[in-house]
Amino acid sequence: VLSGKGGVGKSFVTGAIATELARHGHKVGVLDADITGPSIPKMFGMSGRHVHALGNLMLPEISEHGVKVMSSNLLLQNETDPVLWRGPVIAGAIRQFWSETSWGPIDYLLVDMPPGTGDVALTVFQSLPVDGIVIVTSPQDLVSMIVAKAVNMAEKMNVPILGIVENMSYIECPDCGKKIEVFGKSKLPEVAERYNLDILGTLPINPALAEACDKGEVETALPDGMLPKAVSAVEAITPHETDEA
């Protein structure tokens, strides 16, 4: 799950898809590749928790509803400690999160990418068997250029794009239910047509849900059936179970 820029809610979309897949009975893991700005553990109620070892392997933390998570924040003594690592160290950590973690049998492993198309993205595409990409955007003027970068990267790495999700598309008036496009009219249909992408969903600004994520309650607060097209696109991929290790 990636975006060309920060602040579009990519981690929330990752968490939402993971939660819905788990509700469908799938075994799900989330590899948090946003090493310097991880938010997945907090979203899943793992603040203050740390990974443990099983021999030479790390054990991912498991959420209340069974989602397995591996993140740099789970390795730190305090979750507010900065991760002052250079690029090669970050790349090595991501490879370890994949190859030296005892994921057990899982159906789907979602990778929450950092913003942009730099070293981390290259490491993930070269080191992990990536079956598909979900692009996350917001309704802003730069969306076309940002999507173009993601599309070009996917083509160069020969990875299929499952589709695009637009977050923060609108806010619903609490009194009349009218949709207010606070960031302007969405350009998603035009961009999707230009790059031949499937639209996997548009999400509103939801302050209550954002607050629940900050409290680590995404699994209980997420409405049923959120992002059904995105979940179906992931489920259409033939699952590859990891080894028991």
Question: Model-predicted segments: where are they?
Answer:
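Conserved Switch II/interswitch segment of TRAFAC-class P-loop GTPases
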Residues: 104-111, 117, 129-150
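Residue-level signature of catalytic and energy-coupling elements of molecular machines
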Residues: 6, 32, 40, 70, ...
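Glycine-rich phosphate-binding loops of nucleotide-dependent enzymes
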Residues: 70, 113, 126, 162, ...
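Phosphate-binding/switch loop-helix module in NTP-utilizing enzymes
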Residues: 76-124
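Walker A/P-loop phosphate-binding motif and the immediately C-terminal alpha-helix
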Residues: 1-32, 151
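Short glycine/serine/threonine-rich phosphate/pyrophosphate-binding segments
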Residues: 8-16, 38-41, 113-121, 143-146
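C-terminal lobe/tail of nucleotide-utilizing enzymes
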Residues: 151-245
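Phosphate-binding loop that captures ATP/GTP phosphates
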Residues: 27-80, 84, 91
